[in-house]
C-alpha cells in the first residue's frame, strides 16, 4: 500500500491592497484543494526533499524550497482572476525518497485526471522522477501520445548511481520507458560543459538527448533557442517542463546547491517558459533545487516565482 506522505498546505499570506479584482494578488486567489473542483484550474503541489541532493553529495536545504516559493509568489499581483488551489506538500522523511516520489506521482496523476494543471514546487531535482510518474500514470497519456521532457538545467542528471538521487532522475525515466517498450523525447537547455563529464555527454548521446550548452543560450542567441524549442515542440504532444534553478547565473540564483559560474540569462529562460506555456501542449511543470539557506535577498525564490507566475497566467484560463 502506498504511504500517504501528503501534509496540508500552509496558509498563503501577503500584502493586501483591497479585495476587488483590481487589487488581486496570488495569496488572495489560492485556496486549499477540495474534492469536486471543476477542471481548468492550477494546482500547486509541494515536494519537500533533501534526500536526493544529499545522496548526490550536494548541500542540504532544498526541503524548504516549496514554502519559500509559495512565499515569493504570494504577493505577486495577478492581472486577471484565475482559479488556483494548493494540494499540500509531499514530505520526504527518514530517507524514504522512493516512497515520496511514488506519493508525488499519485498526486500529480490525480490532478491531471481531474483536468487540472499541476505545478510542482521542489525540493531537489529528484522531484523529476515523481512528476514523471504522475504524467506516465495519468489518463492524458494515451497510446500514441508523444511525451517530451524539456529540462532547463546546467546538468544532464543522467548519472548511473547505485541509488536514486538528484543526479539520476532522467536516466531512471529513460530506463523505465525502455523497459515498458515506450519512448519519450528528453531535451536539455543550458548544459554547462565543465559541470558534466565526458561520460555523461556519452550517455546523453546514447539516449539521443538533444541539448544546448549554456554559452549557446545568450540573449543574442534568441533565434538558435527559438529553433531548438520549436523543433522540440513539433516532435511531441504532451510536455513536461522542469526548471532546475541552477541553470541561472549565480548572481541571479545564488540559492541552489550548485551555483552556476556562467549560466543562462533569465531573459532566455523566460522566453522558453513563455513559448512552452503558450504551445497548448504543457501538461505539468516543476521547479527544483531552490535552497533558501543560501538565497541572498530571496533572489532565487523571487526569480523562480516570476517564472511560475508567467507560466501559469499563460496556461490557465482567466475567470470572467
UniProtKB/Swiss-Prot annotation:
Reactions accelerated catalytically: N-formimidoyl-L-glutamate + H2O = formamide + L-glutamate
Protein keywords: Histidine metabolism, Hydrolase, Manganese, Metal-binding
Pfam family, one: Arginase
Keyword Metal-binding part of the UniProt annotation: yes
Keyword Protein biosynthesis attributed: no
InterPro entries assigned: HutG, Ureohydrolase, Ureohydrolase_dom_sf, Ureohydrolase_Mn_BS
Named cofactor requirement(s): Mn(2+)
GO terms classed as biological process: L-histidine catabolic process to glutamate and formamide; L-histidine catabolic process to glutamate and formate; putrescine biosynthetic process from arginine, via agmatine
Organism domain of life: Bacteria
Pathway(s) the chain acts in: Amino-acid degradation; L-histidine degradation into L-glutamate; L-glutamate from N-formimidoyl-L-glutamate (hydrolase route): step 1/1
Textual note on the cofactor: Binds 2 manganese ions per subunit.
GO molecular function: agmatinase activity; formimidoylglutamase activity; manganese ion binding
The enzyme's E.C. designation: 3.5.3.8
HAMAP family in the cross-refs: Formimidoylglutam
Family per record: Belongs to the arginase family.
Function: Catalyzes the conversion of N-formimidoyl-L-glutamate to L-glutamate and formamide.
Stated name of the protein: Formimidoylglutamase
Phylogenetic lineage: Bacteria, Bacillati, Actinomycetota, Actinomycetes, Mycobacteriales
Gene it is expressed from: hutG
Amino acid at each position: 500500500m502506498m504511504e500517504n506522505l501528503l501534509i496540508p498546505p500552509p496558509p498563503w499570506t501577503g500584502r493586501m491592497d483591497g479585495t476587488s479584482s483590481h487589487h488581486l494578488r496570488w495569496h488572495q486567489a489560492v485556496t486549499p484543494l477540495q474534492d469536486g473542483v471543476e477542471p481548468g484550474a492550477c494546482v500547486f503541489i509541494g515536494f519537500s526533499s533533501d534526500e536526493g541532493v544529499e545522496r548526490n553529495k550536494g548541500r542540504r536545504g532544498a526541503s524548504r524550497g516549496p514554502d519559500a516559493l509559495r512565499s515569493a509568489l504570494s504577493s505577486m499581483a495577478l492581472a486577471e482572476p484565475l482559479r488556483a488551489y494548493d494540494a499540500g506538500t509531499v514530505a520526504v522523511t527518514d530517507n524514504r525518497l522512493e516512497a515520496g516520489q511514488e506519493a508525488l506521482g499519485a498526486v500529480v496523476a490525480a490532478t491531471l485526471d481531474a483536468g487540472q494543471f499541476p505545478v510542482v514546487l521542489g525540493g531537489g531535482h529528484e522531484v523529476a522522477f515523481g512528476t514523471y510518474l504522475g504524467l506516465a500514470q495519468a489518463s492524458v497519456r494515451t497510446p500514441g501520445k508523444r511525451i517530451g521532457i524539456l529540462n532547463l538545467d546546467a546538468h544532464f542528471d543522467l548519472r548511473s548511481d547505485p541509488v536514486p538521487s538528484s543526479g539520476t532522475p532522467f536516466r531512471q525515466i529513460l530506463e523505465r520507458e525502455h523497459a515498458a517498450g515506450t519512448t519519450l523525447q528528453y531535451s536539455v537547455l543550458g548544459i554547462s560543459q565543465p559541470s558534466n563529464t565526458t561520460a555523461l555527454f556519452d550517455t546523453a548521446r546514447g539516449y539521443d538527448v538533444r541539448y544546448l550548452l549554456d554559452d549557446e543560450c545568450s540573449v543574442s542567441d534568441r533565434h538558435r533557442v527559438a529553433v531548438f524549442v520549436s523543433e522540440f515542440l513539433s516532435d511531441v504532444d504532451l510536455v513536461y517542463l522542469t526548471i532546475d534553478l541552477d541553470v541561472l547565473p549565480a548572481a541571479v540564483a545564488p540559492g541552489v546547491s550548485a551555483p552556476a559560474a556562467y549560466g543562462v540569462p533569465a531573459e532566455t529562460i523566460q522566453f522558453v517558459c513563455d513559448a512552452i506555456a503558450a504551445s497548448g501542449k504543457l501538461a505539468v511543470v516543476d521547479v527544483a533545487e531552490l535552497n533558501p539557506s543560501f538565497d541572498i535577498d530571496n533572489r532565487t525564490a523571487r526569480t523562480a516565482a516570476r517564472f511560475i507566475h508567467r507560466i501559469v497566467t499563460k496556461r490557465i484560463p482567466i475567470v470572467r
